[in-house]
Regions:
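Conserved catalytic core of the tyrosine transesterase superfamily
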Residues: 1-257
C-alpha cells in the first residue's frame, strides 16, 4: 500500500522507483534490493499473463548496480598444497583426493560433484547435468585422471563384494555423499594443510576459472565449462584476463619493460 495505490493497475514506474529508493535508504544491500525487484517483476509479469494488467511497470525500472567483485579464490600454490594433503593410501583419503582433484580440474558446482554417477565419466571427459537439467561436456586433465583411475579401481574391488554402486563418490549406505559432508572434509584437509585462506567447494570452482583465464583460456570456453547460462556471469574474470595481457605485453614488447 504505497502513496494511495489501492490496485496493481494503479502502479506507475515512478512508484516503483520511489520504492527502490526507500529500500536503499533503509540500508538494504544492492543484492537484497535486486532480489526484491526481481520478486516484484515476477508478480507483475504474472498479473499480465493472467490478464489483470496490460503491461508490467517494473520492467522499465533499472535494477541496483551490483558490485562486480571477483570472488575469493586460492593461489595455485595453495591448491597444490591442498591436493597433497589427503592420505591416498587410505580409502577415504583416496576418495577425498579424487573429489578435490576433479573439482579443481572441472570447476563443477558441489551439487554436481557429489551427484556424479559412474556412467557420467568418459575418457578425459565428464557429462555434467547442471542447473535446469542442462547437460554439458567438461574435460579434465591427466593428474585428475590418474587419481580417478585409482579410486575407480577401489570401487571395482568393492563391487565384487557388495554389488555395483551407480555413484562415483558414495557416502554412507551407498548413497551419494551430502554437500555438507564434502564441505566439512574439504575444510578439514585445508586446515591440516595449513592453508590460511578460506576454502570451500565454491572457492575451488573460482580457482579453476581464475587459473584458466590467467593462463590464457578464452572466456567463452570458461563459460561453457562452468555451465553459466549468460556470459555476463563469467565476465567477473575479465580483469584476470586483462592483468595477463599486461604481463604478456611487459614481457614481450621491446618497450614493455
Amino acid at each position: 500500500h504505497h502513496q494511495g495505490v489501492d490496485h496493481p493497475a494503479q502502479v506507475q514506474t515512478a512508484h516503483i522507483e520511489d520504492w527502490m529508493h526507500d529500500l536503499a535508504e533503509a540500508g538494504l544491500s544492492a543484492s537484497t534490493r535486486a532480489r526484491h525487484r526481481s520478486a516484484m517483476r515476477q508478480l507483475f509479469q504474472f498479473l499480465v499473463a493472467e490478464g489483470e494488467l496490460d503491461d508490467a511497470p517494473g520492467d522499465r525500472v533499472a535494477g541496483p548496480s551490483l558490485p562486480r567483485r571477483l570472488p575469493h579464490t586460492l593461489s595455485e600454490a595453495d591448491v597444490e598444497t591442498l591436493l597433497a594433503q589427503p592420505d591416498r593410501t587410505t580409502r577415504l583419503g583416496l576418495r577425498d583426493a579424487a573429489m578435490i582433484e576433479l573439482l579443481y580440474a572441472t570447476g563443477l558446482r558441489v551439487s554436481e560433484l557429489v551427484g556424479l554417477r559412474q556412467d557420467q565419466l568418459h575418457d578425459g571427459w565428464l557429462i555434467v547435468r547442471g542447473k535446469g537439467s542442462k547437460e554439458r561436456l567438461v574435460p579434465f586433465g591427466d593428474e585428475a585422471a590418474v587419481t580417478l583411475r585409482q579410486w575407480i579401481g577401489v570401487m571395482a574391488q568393492e563391487a565384487v563384494l557388495k554389488g555395483p554402486c551407480p555413484w562415483l563418490f558414495p557416502g554412507r549406505a551407498g548413497r551419494p555423499m551430502t554437500r555438507q559432508n564434502f564441505w566439512e572434509r574439504l575444510r578439514r584437509h585445508a586446515k591440516l594443510a595449513g592453508i590460511q585462506a578460506k576454502v570451500s567447494p565454491h572457492v575451488l570452482r573460482h580457482a579453476f576459472a581464475t587459473h584458466l583465464v590467467s593462463h590464457g583460456a578464452d572466456l567463452r570456453a570458461v563459460q561453457m565449462m562452468l555451465g553459466h547460462a549468460d556470459i555476463s556471469t563469467t565476465e567477473i574474470y575479465t580483469h584476470v584476463a586483462r592483468a595477463r595481457l599486461q604481463r604478456m605485453h611487459a614481457d614481450h614488447h621491446p618497450r614493455g619493460q
